[in-house]
Amino acid sequence: LGDVYKRQSLYTADITRTFPTNGKFTDFQKKLYQAVLDSQQAGFEAAKPGATYSDIHHACMRVIAERLHDWGILPVDVEESLSPEGQQHRRWLACGVAHHLGLDVHDCAQARYESYQNAKIRPGMIFTIEPGLYFREDDLLIPPEYRGIGIRIEDDVLMTEDGPEWISAGIPKRIDDVEAWMADMAAEGVKA
């Protein structure tokens, strides 16, 4: 997992990619990676002028909870997990899934909840969408094949009048594209 940022003319970018160290995802890794990618896409689809960070967060979390349930990991049904009293899915994704970008990588991270999580997203705002799944090595409540795996996909988004635009779209994130990128780097002698 590589989480990198770039500062240009005082402004920042923040992007994360997860790579298979040998250049190819296993079928099991593909399943987990695709869940995170689908979660990110759900967050992107929820992002529109007038939406809130909470809307993006809930869209991403629904996909994560659904997949964890499908895999038999979530100890309750999806709706119970997504309820304010539940949140069992947060065991494997404990952080938020979006933040402002600007002069700081986590711009406005100290803002009050009502003026950040529930504030309306307006055209001109730039933010990330970055869901993930993190399975601890010592988590005995999950099957062994999940343990020690962490996946996050983070991209930068510009909100326009017409909706969101990926501004980090040039960096591969689809499974086939990541594997092709890894193969290109290996051919150039770059090691993962």
Please give the residue ranges for each predicted region.
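Active-site neighborhoods and metal-handling regions in enzymes and metal-associated proteins
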Residues: 2-192
